[in-house]
A protein has these predicted regions:
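C-terminal alpha-helical "lid/dimerization" subdomain adjacent to the S-adenosyl-L-methionine
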Residues: 151-221
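Core SAM-dependent methyltransferase catalytic element
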Residues: 225-247
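Class I SAM-dependent methyltransferase SAM/SAH-binding core
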Residues: 60-106
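A short acidic, Gly/Pro-enriched loop at the edge of an enzyme's catalytic core
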Residues: 109-117
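A short glycine-rich, Lys/Arg-flanked "PGG" loop and its adjoining helix->strand segment in the class I
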Residues: 132-144
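Conserved class I S-adenosyl-L-methionine
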Residues: 1-48, 50-57, 62
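A short SAM/SAH-binding and catalytic strip from SAM-dependent methyltransferases
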Residues: 116-129
Length: 247
């Protein structure tokens, strides 16, 4: 086994602590947070209790668990009705937890009404051209002293300065995050052996839904919307935890 294979095997082991690959109620492949991921979000938060918490792209609501005893109101938002049905079943005995179906951009919450926002394995699915609008919305409803806690797939290094690492990460993510049938039929046969793929090539040749965002891009958009990244906890070069506050 070569160095690259050893490294990628370690990535898989590290990710398994935080991410579960499951089949959603509507039959889709989905990635859900583990209890350890949820606990890590709570540990990262400056708020150990509060009034209102919002989970963006909540899925089955697993990331909410450690926060439920400590917040007066918790709201989970997701596009999938099937995911929300599962989440509602899990939290049916918790009167302070409710769920809404819809896009993050369409949230109908009062200005500066949320203490903490959390999001796990969701925001990377938003195309960059839509990300600024999402950030504007979040900035409006987050309290001035509030925070956004994020656990997600994100290129945490500068991909243009470390092409060999990006190539390894890119190949790994394509193989492990795209639907298996899509990867085997439309991606794997066209990957060139010995070629070092660059971030620019990824942007040029990969459909938007399969592209990977870099932290340096996201930081720029966050800053434009009035946010700043206060803390980064790296798990792998492409997955970690971010604490984001208003600038």
């Amino acid at each position: 086994m070569n160095h690259t294979e050893n490294t990628q095997n370690q990535w898989t082991k590290d990710l398994a602590l935080y991410i579960q690959h499951l089949v959603s109620p509507d039959g889709r492949d989905t990635f859900e947070s583990t209890p350890l991921l949820a606990e890590k979000l709570y540990e990262l938060s400056s708020y150990k209790e509060g009034d209102t918490l919002l989970d963006l792209g909540c899925g089955w609501g697993k990331s909410l668990a450690p926060f439920v005893p400590h917040f007066k109101e918790l709201i989970g938002v997701d596009m999938s009705v099937e995911n929300l049905d599962r989440a509602k079943a899990i939290y049916q005995a918790q009167p302070n937890v409710r769920f809404e179906q819809g896009k993050i951009q369409e949230l109908n919450l009062p200005t500066q009404s949320v203490d903490v926002m959390i999001t796990a394995l969701a925001l990377h699915q938003i195309p960059l051209e839509e990300f600024y609008g999402v950030c504007q919305k979040l900035h409006t409803i987050l309290k001035n002293e509030g925070e956004l806690l994020m656990a997600d797939e994100l290129i945490l290094f500068n991909p243009e300065e470390n092409i060999p690492l990006f190539d390894s990460v890119y190949r790994y993510l394509l193989a492990n995050t795209t639907p298996k049938a899509v990867y085997e039929q439309y991606i794997k046969p066209y990957l060139e052996k010995g070629h070092k793929y660059t971030f620019e090539e990824m942007k040029k040749n990969t459909p938007p839904e399969y592209q990977f965002h870099a932290l340096i891009e996201v930081e720029t958009l966050l800053a434009t919307a009035g946010f700043k990244v206060k803390e980064v906890v790296e798990v792998t070069p492409f997955f970690g935890f971010l604490k984001i506050v208003k600038s």
